[in-house]
Amino acid sequence: MCVFDEFNVQRVINCSGKMTYLGSSILSDKVRKAMDEAGTSYVQMEELMDRAGEVIADYCRSEAACVCAGASAGIIISVAAAITGGDERLVEEVPYVSVKRKKIIIACAHQIDFGAPIRQMIALGGGEMVSVGTVNRCYPWHYEKAIDADTAAILYVKSHHAVQTDQVALADVITLAHKHQLPLILDAAAEEDITKYIEMGCDLVIYSGAKALEGPTSGLIAGRKTLIQACRKQSKGVARAMKVGKENIFGLLAAIKQYGSHSSAMQRQIVDAIVEELKSVKGLTVSVAKDHAGREIYRAKLEVDETVCGMNALMLDQQLRNGSPIIYTRNHNANLGILLLDPRPMQLSDTAIVCQRIKEILAVSL
């Protein structure tokens, strides 16, 4: 009996993406093997953390790196590192640090909720959030005006959750931060390029280990050596509650080692198969859509005409979730009549099942 049956947990066909609430990723054989082997022995955790940092830094082309429990933990730790500088007295004070220099500047459009509000991560790291600009507009002078002697860092977010309209480009914010001798912390949780942002000049870059990298629940921080050392010091303070087990560290190393070996051809094959299968369904307009945040991700886009289908996109999405098998779509724009099917977490065999289920639901409603 498999664990899903043993504990009565339903499997899901994930057409939504690398979502935490759906378990983020499916692990490869190599990652599972690394985790299994890690679970058979004891290890000196400090040595493992050192070696993991060296390996990750090599792949990210950064001065140094460290493992963390996830991208949200990475934000907390990075903020704490920028504020404390690794001073052990201050490390023990986080999040209630007794210094004035703890302001973290972030654009209003980047104050996202990824399942928890980013402002809470800043606060847990001891930071005092300073918001600049408005939701749909931010200029360099907004940042300039906010910087003062009590500013510890600037936090920038690369995410599909963030508003993309009329924001200051990352390259310009990096230049601005360095002009004022401030570290630029980048939340790149689900980003796919693990070298680009270090090469651009970001001081700390945070990635999820379980999203694009397809590793176990984990995260990593890459960047300047002095700041990474300060990040590591947080394990004596707030990061103690966010420690990572040896199994997940080895799993992350296996994932990053094989990263980039996955072919995008299979993903495009899935998208094309969905478009071909559903293009003749009345009331659906089906096409291929590129990721709106600019990543090289292509998804099947379903536009639901309620007057023809007898239901809107929200209703279709709900029926897919409530059916058997359970199917999750990428429903961020369901209120606008749009559902996306993301091929990255899908198996080719899922395609026929998902398309058939959509046809069945719409056939009943017509």
Residue spans for each PLM region:
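Conserved PLP-enzyme active-site core in the AAT-like
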Residues: 1-27, 53-68, 72-260, 272-280, ...
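Short coil/turn segments at secondary-structure boundaries
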Residues: 47-48, 244, 332-333
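Generic C-terminal helix-cap and adjacent flexible tail
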Residues: 360-366
